Swiss-Prot record:
InterPro entries on file: ELA (IPR047853)
GO cellular component entries: extracellular region; extracellular space
Protein name from the UniProt record: Apelin receptor early endogenous ligand
Keywords: Angiogenesis, Developmental protein, Differentiation, Gastrulation, Hormone, Secreted, Signal
Record has 4Fe-4S as a keyword: no
Chief location category: secreted
CDD domains in the cross-refs: Toddler (cd20244)
Taxonomic lineage from the root: Eukaryota, Metazoa, Chordata, Craniata, Vertebrata
Length: 54
């Protein structure tokens, strides 16, 4: 019965990968705040100069 130890090795490896990816997701930069016209910059008028403003 060589299957059971192999299964446990795979199971522990998979759980450690899940644990590592969960920790990394916390360190991602938070979502940047969107200003007017869904733009990341505060003054984005020059980028949207051809779009009529409401």
């Amino acid at each position: 019965m060589r299957f059971q130890p192999l299964f446990w090795v795979f199971f522990i490896f998979a759980m450690s990968l899940l644990f590592i990816t969960e920790e990394k997701s916390v360190n991602f930069p938070r979502r940047r705040k969107l200003y007017r016209h869904n733009c990341f910059r505060r003054r984005c008028i020059s980028l949207h100069s051809r779009v009529p403003f409401p």
